Amino acid sequence: MTSPTNSTMLTYTTNNYYDDDYYEYSTITDYYNTINNDITSSSVIKAFDNNCTFLEDTKYHIIVIHIILFLLGSIGNIFVVSLIAFKRNKSITDIYILNLSMSDCIFVFQIPFIVYSKLDQWIFGNILCKIMSVLYYVGFFSNMFIITLMSIDRYFAIVHPIKRQPYRTKRIGILMCCSAWLLSLILSSPVSKLYENIPHMSKDIYQCTLTNENDSIIAFIKRLMQIEITILGFLIPIIIFVYCYYRIFTTVVRLRNRRKYKSIKIVLMIVVCSLICWIPLYIVLMIATIVSLYTSNIFRHLCLYLNLAYAITFSETISLARCCINPIIYTLIGEHVRSRISSICSCIYRDNRIRKKLFSRKSSSSSNII
């Protein structure tokens, strides 16, 4: 499986695709990037496949969706982070939710760069190109690791409540989250060697793209990232999720304890929504990888690659939508968040009533003077 790189942000030069012998695609991102730039011109598509239609407006629809996701995700996650950060008595679950929201913020604050790069140029320089590429992977790994930690914590809290209770402290939660962030950074750091700010067909336009170098080190890093994403970012977390929640479910059913079910509800919803948002991208990437093994030249199967590009774009947008869904889950299910929101709303309502009373008193006193 190839890696779910930030294909909406990173673009690829098309010169390589005009060579019939070039078909070793390092990541499925290349399919999208090629189509997203020069190959998206209607003249090129008509020249190679008259039966394949291209929707020029699709790119701008995706940009609008990304802007909406940025507004909702930034407001929601900043609210959750500020709410939990200033909470006095934080539980270990609060620590995990706080770090998960911070991980979502990494994706959310990349969206403006993604939107701008959809205009087919990168003006932010080579250093920021590398930083944003690494941050995407850091956000991906940290998101999966923290959700995994939340699942393990719920497993011990319900299946082994007495045996593992001394280890379920706030200090342990902070230590585990710091370890998850550090491991995410270590796993993501090789990406800085893969992406560069490279001039496009026009010398005045630069794009943050996969490097053109084909040495053994670059090839090794590409394979390494594919293995990391597939095994550490997907297979191992999925196995842990299935095992933990199977044991949790059997324990709750056996004990018939509604209180324990209520305690896992928010974590279970986060895990399920995250998987729903990530799995479509993985499926599309897997299909595209299989296709790349049996098709040697993009222009001979242009319509197929174009459809894969659209599928990757939409599935990537769904994965970003996760950043907006998590704050909604906290609000609907989390009792602390709901109570905090209600207290804030009541304070605002009370302040407005006080202002209205003061204003009416001033108005009446001024009228009496007149």
Curated annotation (Swiss-Prot):
Membrane topology per the entry is: Multi-pass membrane protein
Q: Does the keyword Glycoprotein apply?
A: yes
Database matches in CDD domains: 7tmA_Chemokine_R (cd14984)
Q: Which residues lie on this side of the membrane: Extracellular?
A: 1-61, 116-131, 193-223, 287-300
Sorted alphabetically, which SUPFAM superfamilies does this protein's record hold?
Answer: Family A G protein-coupled receptor-like
What would be an example GO MF term here? C-C chemokine binding
Per the record, a Pfam family?
A: 7tm_1
One biological process term from GO is: calcium-mediated signaling
User: Where mainly found?
Assistant: host cell
Q: Can you say where in the cell this protein is located?
A: Host cell membrane
Keywords from the named record: G-protein coupled receptor, Glycoprotein, Host cell membrane, Host membrane, Membrane, Receptor, Transducer, Transmembrane, Transmembrane helix
Transmembrane domains' residue ranges: 62-82, 95-115, 132-152, 172-192, 224-244, 266-286, 301-321
Cellular compartments per GO CC = host cell plasma membrane; membrane
Cytoplasmic membrane side: 83-94, 153-171, 245-265, 322-370
The reply to whether Membrane figures as a keyword in the UniProt entry is yes
InterPro entries from the xrefs? Answer: CCR1-9-like, Chemokine_rcpt, GPCR_Rhodpsn, GPCR_Rhodpsn_7TM
Q: Which residues are reported to be glycosylated?
A: N6, N51
Q: What does this protein do?
A: Putative chemokine receptor.
Family note: Belongs to the G-protein coupled receptor 1 family.
Specify the protein name: G-protein coupled receptor homolog K2
